[in-house]
């Protein structure tokens, strides 16, 4: 309920154990929602979505693919911040676009609000899911609860992990209720996801984050750092 509220409401949450599992859930949901024949997920070069075979295939870093090739089919990569390239990659086989609000492993590249809005527009026009991978950026780290909240967009699916359990292994995949309804009984499950220990840790973590206004503190720290950097010659 807390996560759904922080994401604007109207969604459902599936708990897992790691960011990769949350992204696997999101991409399986996209295929189930879109139906047979629409199995391709588009991501960007420089992205990082996990180390399982599917999330590694979605990761847009060919050097990471080499030792484990061939990669599973169904993943397509486009240039970062290039809406024209993204549009050209969308055909009748695509079900979703997965994007990080800030690329971490790709070199710390923030997505401009206009870029995220453009992705939302393309997803609406082509009937695709917009998946936000907030594993690294979520839960206050960017000055908002989630990185996409710096832009005027409403994703269909949001994944998160890392900060959620404050060191305890828990992740979550949030989806709009009408999207989550695509999963049928038996489609997706986990043995340890959502167990009492980890969810209690996540609930306590979120309570502290809200009580101490972690997003506000991140905004303040970011402003101090930006101000100091701007005083340096040549920066």
Identify the residue ranges that each predicted region occupies:
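Conserved N-terminal phosphate-binding loop of PLP-dependent enzymes in the Aspartate aminotransferase
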Residues: 1-235
């Amino acid at each position: 309920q807390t996560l759904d509220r922080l994401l604007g409401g109207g969604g459902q949450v599936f708990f897992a154990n790691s960011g990769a599992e949350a992204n696997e859930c999101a991409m399986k949901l996209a295929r189930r929602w879109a139906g047979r024949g629409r199995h391709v997920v588009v991501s960007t070069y420089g992205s990082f979505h996990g180390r399982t075979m599917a999330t590694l295939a979605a990761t847009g870093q060919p050097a990471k693919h080499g030792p484990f090739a061939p990669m599973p089919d169904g993943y397509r990569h486009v240039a970062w911040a290039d809406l024209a390239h993204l549009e050209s990659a969308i055909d009748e086989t695509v079900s979703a676009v997965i994007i990080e609000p800030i690329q971490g492993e790709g070199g710390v590249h923030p997505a401009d609000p206009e870029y995220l809005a453009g992705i939302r527009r393309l997803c609406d026009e082509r009937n695709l899911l917009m998946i936000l991978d907030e594993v690294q950026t979520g839960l206050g780290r960017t000055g908002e609860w989630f990185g996409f909240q710096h832009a005027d967009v409403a994703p269909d699916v949001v994944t998160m992990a890392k900060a959620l359990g404050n060191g305890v292994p828990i992740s979550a995949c949030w989806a709009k209720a009408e999207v989550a309804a695509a999963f049928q009984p038996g489609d997706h499950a986990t043995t340890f996801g959502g167990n009492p220990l980890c969810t209690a840790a996540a609930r306590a973590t979120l309570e502290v984050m809200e009580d101490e206004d972690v997003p506000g503190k991140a905004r303040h720290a970011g402003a101090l750092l930006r101000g100091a950097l701007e005083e340096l010659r040549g920066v």
